[in-house]
Amino acid sequence: AENKLLYLLDEKPMFRYLFDRLVKVCQRHPEWEMIVVTQYPEIEHQVKALQENEQQGERFPVKTVISKDSYKGAAYSVKAGIRAAGDADAYAFFVADQPYFTEESVEGFLEKMEREAKVVPGCVTWNGQEGNPVWFPAKYGKELLELEGDAGGRKVFRRYREKAVFYEVSLEKELEDIDYMPEIEKMRITEGGTEKTFHVYVIE
């Protein structure tokens, strides 16, 4: 099956858009670490190549974890990420197919969660519509590790929704994930206040 995360958006794989923004944000916050959980060796190789190409002295706050069971459902990616995070104080789960999610929203979401969601979960919203990413303090780790099949962190989030902290994004489009693309399609992404057109190509 084709891997949508490797679709090229103007010569850049789709997963790289949010990935690159996360790296920039984490580089500004030395206490934050980014863990890439993937079942795809191609993505692991690309991330490692980026790490090797980083300028000497530049912090590349990324750890890569291959999760061979992720094809069984989202729960296995969640569990692999938590195990790799060790004694982290909290977990923030981002998905790689949200190329519209901005750098400003990444940083704003994480900073708000650190301030206001130390003991409760959180997620992003737009006009009352909830979406990814989702945040959990470490005390929810046991429940997250009990997830099975295609149940992601949102299943645990719903149990505690009345206590949750929410972060409002600026644009509805930021919450869109890309579940299907034709072989060539035009997409529009707003970056730094400027709307850009991207041509999307499938890697054969």
At which residue positions do the language-model features occur?
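Residues at secondary-structure transition points
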Residues: 1-13, 68-76, 100, 104, ...
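N-terminal glycine-rich phosphate-binding loop and ensuing alpha1 helix
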Residues: 1-40
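Alpha-helical elements of Rossmann-like donor-binding domains used by nucleotide-donor carbohydrate transfer enzymes
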Residues: 17, 21, 76-80, 108, ...
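Residues at the starts of beta-strands that form the adenosine-phosphate
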Residues: 31-34, 89-90, 163
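Short phosphate-binding loop-to-helix
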Residues: 42-90
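Conserved beta-loop-beta/alpha segment of the NTase-like Rossmann-fold superfamily
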Residues: 71-138
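A generic structural signal for short hydrophobic patches within well-formed alpha-helices
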Residues: 106, 140-144, 183-184
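Conserved alpha/beta core of the MobA/IspD/sugar-nucleotide pyrophosphorylase nucleotidyltransferase superfamily
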Residues: 146-204
